[in-house]
């Protein structure tokens, strides 16, 4: 026997296997979704179909057939991309009307669309692709089962009353105040035998606008995965807790919009969508229904807030009490959880522009405060009725005369305790006249002795005369100085040196020379200022400023008048002998001549000043 040798394949066999393998990789394949698919009667359905591994032109043709359960072997032509006469009679009218159509996505992919499913549309759908290949290899059609479910989704407005009451047949019209809560309920249920999820959302359309996807603005909704999501304009309010959505029981959903705003007005709808999970794991919406919940009007505070004042123009005397009443009116929500109010009084002097300055106010918590310049006075601001506020000045002054206005502000509460001003209103002006005290003051001041020298004490006297005024008038006097700079008075305001108040208490300011100062009352209407150890820095123009004060019944003081004396010049002279010691460093003889010259000059100047005076 000869040795065994391995059997060699013919050279053409490996090549043939490779060709067969390559042809298998390029075999035609038609792909449709995995079934069965569940859809609801009356809704739209889309079934995709695409082909791969084909030969021939890039644009392939597609034909759709239906095999009904009662005739599983009978193919009913639905629609074709090639033949317009392809449809069987049962589909012809629907195809012509566009209710059933095939839409090409690209050359090798299409989608079958049925606008409104009917119960007889259930069955096996086949997508067939006529061959354009050189050899018949692969699959030329794909099949998927479609099951049509009855429409059992129900959506309606939830009745505001207890369970069991029927919702009204027509949508109600609701009116809420700005800042109040807007609460709406929706009933959504389904009895589909398959496992489905409901997504429920609340939407709003502007008043009188037609309802549609383009006009309906989503407020908030619960998705099919139970996540709560708000529409873009409401996302911030949802995050802040002003917007809430919850499920009560098995089929009731409740939306609460806290702190209603003017932009919340409109027609509210509830939309329920039923979702099912297809065999490929994706979720598909199989039904959707919408119900009108209510037509909502938001009554803004700015359109309702009104302020009136009384009792009318007032004329009173100084020291008399002044009472003014302010009434806040309008269809307003009560102060509390959703709304808050503040009320204040403003006063502007007669003829002054603008509302003026704040006198007193009650804030949103009912805490009173006085405006700048009114501290220390007996002024009361109180609430005397549900919407009536009273301002009382225990003792009016002439400076209280002017135009009074009452200012009311309305606030709404946002999330937590945050307040947002929603409206404000001012009353008409209320004139108040206060008689003047009729006090006339005059003051005469002079330097005692006429001439003062350095190191001495300068005494300045001020006599005050008074005409008119009530009994018990008190006088006060203060001394002021203006310093010269380069021979002229400085533009700096006068500086207080000292004075005696209406209560007899002395007040000391700052003396230019820094030495001791004394102020005293030397007579009923005579005041004296003394500058001890006078120095060159004390040079200046002094004046006396008296003022008249009246104490009212509330023990507050009111300045009833003031005056200013004429200027008093204080010039500290040097003693003549002091000048002899200045030039000793340059010789005694020169000092005597210089001293005599200076002495003569000073004496001459002094005599000239006396003659001028």
UniProtKB/Swiss-Prot annotation:
Glycosylation sites: 50, 327, 463
Example GO BP: skeletal muscle tissue development
Listed GO CC annotations: extracellular exosome; hippocampal mossy fiber to CA3 synapse; intracellular membrane-bounded organelle; membrane; plasma membrane; presynaptic membrane
Region described as Disordered: 155-174
Signal peptide interval: 1-27
Record's comment describing the protein's domains: The Ig-like C2-type domains 3 and 4 are required for interaction with CD81.
Full protein name: Immunoglobulin superfamily member 8
